[in-house]
Amino acid sequence: MRGILVTGALGQIGSELVPALRDHYCVDRVIASDLCVTQAQPETKGPYENLDCTQPHQILEVVRRHDVGTIYHLAALLSATAEKRPLAAWDINLGGLYNVLEAARQHRCQVFFPSTIGAFGPSTPRYQTPQVTIQRPTTMYGVTKVSGELLCDYYAARFGVDSRGLRLPGLISYVAPPGGGTTDYAVEIFYQALRYMHYTCFLGPNTRLDMMYMPDAIRSMVALMEADIATLRHRSAYNVTAMSITPEELAAEIRKHIPKFAIDYQVDPVRQAIADSWPCSVDDSAAREDWGFAPQFNLAGMVTDMLARLGERQRPTKGEIDSSSRGVRWQSTA
């Protein structure tokens, strides 16, 4: 079996994708990579490479040395961070993808590229956004993702690179902390609910966005990469979703488990503007028809599982509760 390289392996998706791939295939053939290692992370317990995707020679060297046949290219700046650092976002998100596709062209690799609901914009139909529609994003993150979709299509048509991708919604994970995305509230809320029974949300209460629980996202990536290419009509950018929710709806579901949980709102105008430019829901019928996409978690199931898995790891001690009530804020050491 040829190697599987995961770039951005220490990020939100990579932290769960790498172990899943190692369980599904072979530990020694899944190579995790990222810019650096800051602590003993599980991703480094198999093959690991320090890799800067903006440096093409580094990618080529890793691909050659490990005989890589598949690349999951996850390295990117997320939406809110990309707005603060637009030039870096262009260099990392698009320049890094170009370097990966070039390595794939030279070494006949399959490539997975994660696109996003951020690839759409305010002129796109907001409800049941079609698979093929207007894509005029108003953020640098979205611009790099639309460009990435087109670049993958180009390399497939021009050079025969087997590139595949998903337009991912907001992802909810209990493994990795939030990473600078507009949908991060849907992760932060669980930590705060368990710690303080209170959360201040940076998006408005009725901001409706598509979401997916990370286990469903991981299964979907692997399923797409294993699918028969002859069935894939939209190979580089399939719409996928599992639920369309608002902060208020998520809080209400959490309240079924933590009745005293309270939420209030301090809207961040930058992130709210980003969210308002995205679809409220997408049509993922093409993914369901072409390769059998079928998420297992709805809102209720996701909330139940998130709270159970964070559980005792996040619950405060009595001393922490007392400190919190006196205005002392708990800080994670993670």
Where are these regions (language model features)?
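N-terminal Rossmann NAD(P)H-binding glycine-rich loop of SDR-like oxidoreductase domains
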Residues: G3-D23
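NAD(P)H-binding glycine-rich loop region in Rossmannoid oxidoreductase-like domains
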Residues: C53-I92
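Short alpha-helix in the Rossmann-fold core of NAD(P)-dependent oxidoreductases
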Residues: I92-L97, F112, T144-K145
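NAD(P)-dependent short-chain dehydrogenase/reductase
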Residues: D153-R208, M214-R219, A223
